[in-house]
Amino acid sequence: MDLIPRLFAEFQALLDRHEAALAYCDCIEATLLGQMDYPRVPLPPDWDGSHRYAGDAGTIAHVISSSRHRRRLQRVLQRRQRRWAEAAQRTGLTAAQGQEAALDAAVLDLADVLLTTPARTLDAVVLKLGVLLSTREPGSHAETTSPWRELRLILVDLRGLAD
């Protein structure tokens, strides 16, 4: 008996739950952004006059040489980060992000189970390769680099054989 189709159905259901959790986080965050901006501080304009911002103390330290100005910006940033964290907690964003992270880990764990389960049919190999590409490919920039390009081409070949 081939377990891959059942595992793949579970994987798809978990992936759908994860996508819904991401959308929920985005919705809460959009509401929060309607009330306040991301916690950041303005930096002096760049060489071309463009506006720059810092969202972390390291960036401030790298850009601002005056210790007094640097400390002031870092304190302002800390206050803004604290307000953001409090608002995120109050609106449920922090809890939603925790749920999303747990679902993401569960998706990857189930992908590992699926990928290590022996395939008994060509269709199961196609499903396994699809899961491998969807969970392990480094990103869209890798679509044209080896071995990801070749793995995608092999997946197309296998799908053709499976039909």
Predicted regions and their residues:
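Sequence/structural signature of long amphipathic alpha-helices
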Residues: 1-163
